[in-house]
Amino acid sequence: MFNVTKKSIEWGGETLTLETGKVARQADGSVIATLGETSVMANVTFAKAAKPGQDFFPLTVHYQERYYAAGKVPGGFFKREARPSEKETLTSRLIDRPIRPLFVDGFKNEVLLIVTVLSHDLVNEPDIVAMIAASAALTISGVPFMGPIGAARVGYANGEYVLNPDVDDMQKLRENPEQRLDLVIAGTKDAVMMVESEAYELSEAEMLGAVKFGHEAMQPVIDMIIDFAEEAAKEPFDFSPPDYAALYAKVKSLGEAQMRAAFAIREKQERVNAIDAARAAIKAQLSDAELADENLGTAFKKLESSILRGDIINGGARIDGRDTKTVRPIISETSVLPRTHGSALFTRGETQALVVTTLGTGEDEQIIDALHGNSRSNFLLHYNFPPYSVGEVGRFGPPGRREIGHGKLAWRALQAVLPAATDFPYTIRVVSEITESNGSSSMASVCGGSLSMMDAGVPLKAPVAGVAMGLILEDDGKWAVLTDILGDEDHLGDMDFKVAGTENGITSLQMDIKVAGITPAIMEQALAQAKDGRMHILGEMSKALSSANSFSAYAPKIETLTIPTDKIREVIGSGGKVIREIVETSGAKVDINDDGVIKIASNDQAAIKKAYDMIWSIVAEPEEGQIYTGKVVKLVDFGAFVNFFGKRDGLVHVSQIANKRLTHPNEVLKEGQEVKVKLLGFDERGKVRLGMKMVDQETGQEIAPEKKEEATEA
């Protein structure tokens, strides 16, 4: 009944297994990949014909994590998985980016790739396993895919690269000074296709070394998929790339001159309008059959690409007049919004980001529910890309995959320079509103985010800047690396290579390559140019702000207090009674974590002090010899019980009440009376012994010994 094919190798200290032929047999390609005890299933289906008029490649990738994979039940009212989480969205993009360029040019049939996490051992991250499963499923499906690809995660600890670090090693990268890198790489046998990383100020050489290490480490996986496909692959789908040479030749002859003139215009909107006019002029001269040809859009793109790329390769001139290494003009402004905690307007050429920082308390931390367990994040970065930023009318709604991905890239770039939570106990939310875009808006978000946080008073370890690099690589081997690319250079070029960091090193690197043949020499040149560009941008940013501003008057003030964990129960009280009383009495917000760290927040410093004192009175231990204010709670023949130092009670013996003989404490005291007492010590049972007669009841000061004697004589 089943025709199972199974292959296994030892990889990175774990067993990696690929299996097909038993599950999802009606899919064009189905593979279950297992690393350790983490199993991921990838299923591929594709349409056997393109839709009429289809002028793009409709590839859809869905990565989904099932809670049962880790033995968990989903939260929420419905108790089932709902819309994709941020991690699922980011992993879908992680799979999509390296495989998309490997489909045969001209293939426009719809392809659907669904990747499902079936089992998670809480050791091996499922994203790498998912990429391997997806690659294997595509390779055996028969779809015209020029893979396979391999994938690997690279860490960097104690000067050594580490293959596929454990989940725990990566989960708290910010809190682990020994682990300085989380890099995911995917590529073919001969070329790197995609890199995604966050780092802690690593050098260009260290980052390039990580890429080389990861590419070499994935080679056994690629070989394994090839062996696997030799046994399990279906017949290749009969597809021949369309021949549109005649159509392209006609389009070129009719409109190359006008299109070249349009690309010579330096202002984006003018250039876009001129390109549209050139297209319209060409279309006006085409026959109905040529206009209906589904390859017309491809012919236009090829013409535009040849003009832009040829000018750069042959003369080094870009469409906005810059050479290959120049960054566009930069203007940085801070404190642009009066009532926000921090704000910045970062403008680089025709790309602009308005970035706002808001400081919150522990209540504002994001709770992340993941397969490996719940966690909290005190740094959030949200990226918004409205249609008006590119002068278009379009969809407006919740953030899409691109916005989530760009926001995470900026988050990765900035998280390395954040202060420790113990030094700066605030939740930080950064929102980047892209108000203009002509390339590299995510890197504008990094620059604006750095300025905005410093404007809010966040003590960053160092300012961060980012720059997007591009590449033109021709078939004859000629190439050019471009600094600070425009939107057209991204769209028509061969590489999008974003690098962010401080003066000391790289904090984030993302690379997407559309062609094979990217050599180490090209990557070294790109990293070197990116460093020069980053240093220039940091210099321009420093003209607006070079260090953290004073703290915003509108931000909440927070003080932290660390208590023994065995005292947490006392501060919270039965059913939260004590903590509610503290909040209601003081007016401050109080947040307690399991480690005994208490954050007290309020816009009113007096409220913070009130809450602080109330908590301290509960958790602190009274000191022998100190004087405290208390209240008489009960009178008995042998003395008075006094409540002091929060909820503590102690006995003032009748002989310690006054400097005269008393027959009963009620001669000088009454219940509810406020008194000043000195802690004399503890009896053999640990009970508190208090005294009053040695304390001046008006001033609360201890009476000098000679005064006691005078009082006794009197």
UniProtKB/Swiss-Prot annotation:
Question: Which biological process, per GO, is one annotated for this protein?
Answer: RNA processing
| Catalytic activity entry | RNA(n+1) + phosphate = RNA(n) + a ribonucleoside 5'-diphosphate
Organism superkingdom: Bacteria
Q: Where is the signal peptide?
A: none
Predominant cellular place of this UniProt entry's protein: cytoplasm
S1 motif domain mapped to chain residues: 625-693
Please provide one cellular component term from the Gene Ontology annotations of this protein.
Answer: cytosol
Tell me, what is one Gene Ontology molecular-function annotation carried by this entry?
magnesium ion binding
Q: What does this protein do?
A: Involved in mRNA degradation. Catalyzes the phosphorolysis of single-stranded polyribonucleotides processively in the 3'- to 5'-direction.
Q: Return the protein name.
A: Polyribonucleotide nucleotidyltransferase
Species name for this entry?
Answer: Cereibacter sphaeroides (strain ATCC 17025 / ATH 2.4.3) (Rhodobacter sphaeroides)
